Amino acid sequence: MLFEQWAPCKDLALVYSDRDTWDSMLQQGVQLLERFTQDGRVKIRRPRSQQQIQFTRRLTAGNSFVGFVDAIGELDGTPCVLEWKTSSARYPSEPEGIVALDPQLICYSWMTGIEQVAQVVFIRKRLVEVQYLRATISDQQRQEFQTLVEDTVKRIEAGQFLPHSGIRFPQNPCSSCPFLGLCLDQRQLIDTALVRKPGVDLGLFDELAY
């Protein structure tokens, strides 16, 4: 199946990183699947119907939130929502509880009503690795996420598009954030990104201490 899906890409004009080729990525994919199978920690009893599952949640204003869950199955015998990930590095597992803060896992739990969630991370490196991260999402987290969703819908309908941070996970380089440079007081980045409107007195910010 992997070869069948990957074979049509061989003749495409794809741009690979310095260390990657079509053959090397195929080999890594095979090795990752072999490791995943050998671990034997994940079970999906009905793979044809329990993967890429569509869920629809009705919101209070009459709107619908539509999402797709990667899979519902078991990790180490515990029923849970499963999320597949690929990465070139391990995801952080400390401090304790950090996995439960992942917005996508909270979303999956809210969509399905299932409190147990897990990430299965296929790590592409010289010695391949599969990482298993589990978390329990609380009722409070699900309620807060629904409030966030409904508030976001209201802002979209009102045409309010507020800036938000652009931190990438797990490496977390600041690459696409509207506040780039401000949090670390990097003056060159601030001068490049900051727009000063005519007639606005910003002198008070010179008095702030960080």
Regions flagged by a language model, labelled:
Residues 1-54, 58:
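A non-catalytic, helix-rich entry segment at domain boundaries
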Residues 17, 21, 93-97, 137:
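Conserved aromatic-histidine-acidic binding/catalytic patches
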Residues 29, 71, 177:
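A residue-level signal for conserved active-site and pocket-lining positions in enzyme catalytic cores
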Residues 31, 35, 80, 106-110:
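Residue-level signal for well-ordered alpha-helical scaffold segments within enzymatic catalytic domains
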Residues 43, 73-79, 111-117:
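Secondary-structure boundary elements
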Residues 47-51, 67-69, 115:
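Generic beta-strand structural signal
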Residues 53-107:
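Non-catalytic protein-protein interaction segments used by genome-maintenance enzymes to assemble
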Residues 98, 107-210:
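Metal-dependent nuclease catalytic regions and adjoining charged, substrate-binding loops involved
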